[in-house]
């Protein structure tokens, strides 16, 4: 069992180093089993499947970093070399399971997953079946299909089915190891950068209908599994955008026809995509909102650390304060220096300092000079308890609740998308007691926060992850693609 997972935003000024993996998850051998058994993660699902099928498990390593810039060459080499060394020590293997993201970019290769799988293949040989899991937002290259025989992508966004999809991949791997099947992968993609409404599955949108069609197609003789990926637009790589992956058993022609039909279906929904509201619209709605027993949840799509955003943009916080919004909480604003200063002041301390906006003031607002009271401090360690990644430990780093006027600001040291109520609770903020909850997240917040919300507002506050791809300059992306180019239907 191996995990090497990262979603890389190539438009950020930052890179992702080994410390970023250590801040999230970097464990080896038996520690993998101890930390991830029984969790809603891919490795957790694989461990459960292995027990069900009676495998002798050889845990290699689990390396996961929160989304950010391309993975540094130092980090890539360390993780890859460690994985290969442990594989060599693991002895004779019958199969390999690898939890990937699908949108990893390294400093030396725009296709980080294939780069890693090349090394794994060189270590284990060409005959052993390799099964991978992929995020629904994978940018799938043709090369990945050369190194893996089995690929299963998430079918939900928010991603609440990681463990289940890992189990599905392991079922196919078990059949391949027993020589019941000889799987192969085929990948196809429409000429699109944006598609599938970014993969949202919380309503009856394009992705739900495409996934239903994929499930029906997968019933054809010779086909083993069909995955659909919405792609990741914040990565300037050749294969960015939606794709279809078909796993088949000596049925290449049927697989190719299936993939093409699904690509045509994805293309037919090309104009069905949702853009968030402007900051001004959101503030106007908050001002006019009637009091309710449930909070209004405001999601800052554009400053989502889960998409590689900086998480320190201040435009939305500034607008809340200027509008005089009361009984609100905002999380998380990532500023390690501010957190350190506030922790030194201690609970009850009243402090004036510059907060946020330090990564790139041109993207979503520069530093804000704020005066407020330190309400709570924390080392940032917590365990997710909601529908997504339940049971998985997380580390926000030194964190504080800083009350500024009517807003409790969760300030953290490490980047972490808001998708679990416990992130607020860990610093004494009760989400149910607030009138307004602001979360830096695109879609994952919905799993835990939508059930407690009176209304959900999704906002583009000008951060790095703005969904308007026409603002960006793509250099590596294949062309022509929708919506950047005119393409005849």
Regions found by a protein language model. Give the residues of each.
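N-terminal amphipathic/basic leader segments beginning at the initiator methionine
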Residues: 1-52
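Generic secondary-structure signature for well-ordered alpha-helical cores
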Residues: 51-55, 85-88, 122-125, 153-156, ...
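Cap/lid and interdomain-hinge subdomains that line or gate substrate/regulatory clefts
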Residues: 54-61, 67, 104, 131, ...
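Hard-cation-handling environments
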Residues: 197-405, 410-411
């Amino acid at each position: 069992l191996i995990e090497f997972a990262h979603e890389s935003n190539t438009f950020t000024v930052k890179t992702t180093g080994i410390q970023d993996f250590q801040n999230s998850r970097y464990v080896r051998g038996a520690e993998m089993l101890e930390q991830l058994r029984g969790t809603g993660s891919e490795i957790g699902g694989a461990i459960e499947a292995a027990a069900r099928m009676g495998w002798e498990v050889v845990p290699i390593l689990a390396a996961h970093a929160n989304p950010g810039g391309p993975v540094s060459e130092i980090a890539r080499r360390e993780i890859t070399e460690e994985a290969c060394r442990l594989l060599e020590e693991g002895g004779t293997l019958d199969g390999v399971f690898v939890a990937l993201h699908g949108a990893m970019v390294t400093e030396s290769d725009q296709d980080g997953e294939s780069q890693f799988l090349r090394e794994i293949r060189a270590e284990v040989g060409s005959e052993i079946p390799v099964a991978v899991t992929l995020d629904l937002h994978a940018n799938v290259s043709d090369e990945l299909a050369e190194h893996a025989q089995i690929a299963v992508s998430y079918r939900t966004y928010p991603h609440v089915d990681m463990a289940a999809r890992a189990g599905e991949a392991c079922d196919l791997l078990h059949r391949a190891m027993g020589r019941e099947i000889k799987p192969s992968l085929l990948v196809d993609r429409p000429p699109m950068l944006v598609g599938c409404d970014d993969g949202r599955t919380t309503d009856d949108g394009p992705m739900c209908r495409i996934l239903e069609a994929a499930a029906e197609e997968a019933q054809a003789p010779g086909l083993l599994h069909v995955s659909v990926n919405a792609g990741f637009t914040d990565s300037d790589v050749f294969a960015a955008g939606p794709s279809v992956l078909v796993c088949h058993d000596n049925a290449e022609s049927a697989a190719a026809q299936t993939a093409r039909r699904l690509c045509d279906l994805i293309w037919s929904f090309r104009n069905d995509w949702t853009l968030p509201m402007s900051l001004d619209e959101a503030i106007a709605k908050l001002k006019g909102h009637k009091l309710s027993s449930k909070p209004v949840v405001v999601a800052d799509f554009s400053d989502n650390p889960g998409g590689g955003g900086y998480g320190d943009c201040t435009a939305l916080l500034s607008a809340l304060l200027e509008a005089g919004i009361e009984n609100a909480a905002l999380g998380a604003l990532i500023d390690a220096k501010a957190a350190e200063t506030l922790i030194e002041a201690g609970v009850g301390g009243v402090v004036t300092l510059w907060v946020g906006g330090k990564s790139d003031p041109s993207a979503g607002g520069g530093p804000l000079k704020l005066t407020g009271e330190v309400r709570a401090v924390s080392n940032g360690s917590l365990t997710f308890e909601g529908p997504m990644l339940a049971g998985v430990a997380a580390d926000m780093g030194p964190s504080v609740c800083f009350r500024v006027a009517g807003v409790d600001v969760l300030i953290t040291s490490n980047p972490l998308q808001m998708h679990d109520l416990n992130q607020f609770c860990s610093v004494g903020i009760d989400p149910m007691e607030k009138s307004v909850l602001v979360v830096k997240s695109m879609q994952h917040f919905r799993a835990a926060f939508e059930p407690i919300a009176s209304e959900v507002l999704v906002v583009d506050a000008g951060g790095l992850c703005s969904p308007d791809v026409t603002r960006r300059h793509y250099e590596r992306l294949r062309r022509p693609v929708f919506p950047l180019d005119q393409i005849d239907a």
